[in-house]
């Protein structure tokens, strides 16, 4: 049976759920797909289909990023169910980097937890400018307690530059909505309306040279190697030539799909799978970049403005100095780098500093690009590239 082609009839946005483990992100994602499926604009994806890796089912946590799609009256969304567990924040960094907006899920029973704050900080660092809050499990909570949690969340968002007073906060129950309770399915509608109206259509750089950071690599027997990810900028069509930076390969795109539907052309903001001609599976990996030929020159050295997380925000307890060698999470790549603080010499937790970084390998860099700094499984800093050195 031939696949139905993807037809672009509505503007496309990338949205995601984030928040602390067990606050109900995946349940809420399933509830959104169920409510919209009943409206006739999507396919219901049950909870156990979203949380799909075996180790997740055992531990009840989302590790790999799961994508679902749905439509509201005015938009088409690709929805990323974001990891909630601290060990997996590195996935969050690569997942959040391609989001146009996010739904912050906070349990009305528990309030703000450590990962709630870390996810908000990361969202800010990787350029997610608009957040809508879902106060989940609102069916089980005391109203006054829920009011306090809402206040707490607004203060957290304000502290991270999100204008907490104007952020929509919607009280929901993912579980009750899945059970079909009309009060709570209406709350899901209200949440989606808030996303539709509060998260603006981003400026898409469709005319810039094509660039896609590789999130995943698959092999289709008899057809070749497939890379998946979100198009950062530009447009790509079947038959276009591309460079795979990191693999040092030039090739041709022989197939293009989004959510299993073939498409003629993908553009900035689309989540896509690209079939690459004659590229061995082991030549390409997550962190590589697929780009228009000759459009990007990878570099190792750059200068950046970096915020070193305070101890209270889960950062280091001691300062960093020149010679520090953490992991730099840049787009979907993670690379070790040497830090030179110049005359500053040391940076204490809570400081914002300028640093020069020498990476362990060449990475496509450009001014304005955001990144996270991690060590020992936690985020310790976040910054923006200011200049790239040859």
Curated annotation (Swiss-Prot):
GO MF term set: GTP binding; GTPase activity; translation elongation factor activity
Residues binding GTP: 19-26, 81-85, 136-139
Region (G4): 136-139
Residue intervals passing through the bilayer: none
Chain positions covered by the region annotation G1: 19-26
Main location: cytoplasm
UniProt-annotated stretches for the region G3: 81-84
Gene3D superfamilies assigned to the protein according to its UniProt record, in alphabetical order: P-loop containing nucleotide triphosphate hydrolases, Translation factors
Domain tr-type G: 10-203
Top-level taxonomic group: Bacteria
Broadest EC class assigned to this enzyme: hydrolase
Region (G2): 60-64
Region annotation G5: where it falls in the sequence: 173-175
Similarity section: Belongs to the TRAFAC class translation factor GTPase superfamily. Classic translation factor GTPase family. EF-Tu/EF-1A subfamily.
Name of the protein in its database record: Elongation factor Tu 2
Organism lineage: Bacteria, Bacillati, Actinomycetota, Actinomycetes, Kitasatosporales
């Amino acid at each position: 049976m031939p696949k139905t082609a993807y037809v672009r009839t509505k503007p496309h946005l990338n949205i995601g759920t984030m928040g602390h483990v067990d606050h109900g992100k995946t349940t809420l994602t399933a509830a959104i797909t169920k409510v919209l499926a009943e409206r006739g604009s999507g396919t219901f994806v049950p909870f156990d289909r979203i949380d799909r890796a075996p180790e997740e089912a055992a531990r009840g946590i989302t590790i790999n990023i799961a994508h679902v799609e749905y439509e509201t009256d005015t938009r088409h969304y690709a929805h990323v169910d974001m990891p909630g567990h601290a060990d997996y924040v590195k996935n969050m960094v690569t997942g959040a980097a391609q989001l146009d907006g996010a739904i912050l899920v906070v349990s009305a029973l528990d309030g703000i937890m450590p990962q709630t704050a870390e996810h908000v900080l990361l969202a800010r660092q990787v350029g997610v400018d608009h957040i809508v809050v879902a106060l989940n499990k609102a069916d089980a909570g005391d109203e006054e307690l829920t009011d306090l949690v809402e206040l707490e969340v607004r203060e957290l968002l304000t502290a991270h530059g999100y204008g907490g007073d104007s952020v929509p906060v919607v009280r929901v129950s993912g579980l009750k909505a899945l059970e079909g309770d009309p009060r709570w399915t209406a709350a899901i509608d209200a949440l989606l309306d808030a996303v539709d109206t509060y998260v603006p259509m981003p400026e898409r750089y469709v005319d810039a040279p094509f660039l896609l950071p590789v999130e995943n690599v698959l092999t289709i027997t008899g057809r070749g190697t497939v890379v998946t990810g979100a198009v950062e900028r530009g447009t790509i069509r079947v038959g276009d030539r591309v460079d795979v930076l990191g693999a040092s390969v030039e090739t041709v795109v022989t197939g293009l799909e989004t959510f299993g539907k073939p498409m003629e052309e993908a553009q900035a903001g689309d989540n896509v799978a690209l079939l690459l001609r004659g590229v061995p599976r082991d030549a390409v990996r997550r962190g590589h970049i697929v780009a228009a030929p000759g459009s990007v020159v990878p570099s190792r050295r750059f200068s950046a403005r970096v915020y070193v997380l305070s101890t209270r925000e889960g950062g280091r307890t001691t300062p960093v100095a020149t010679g520090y060698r953490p992991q730099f999470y840049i787009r979907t790549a993670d690379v070790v780098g040497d830090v030179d603080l110049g005359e500053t010499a040391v940076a204490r937790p809570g400081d914002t500093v300028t640093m020069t970084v020498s990476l362990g390998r060449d990475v496509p860099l450009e001014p304005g690009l955001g990144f996270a700094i991690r060590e020992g499984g936690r985020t310790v800093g976040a910054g923006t590239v200011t200049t790239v050195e040859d």
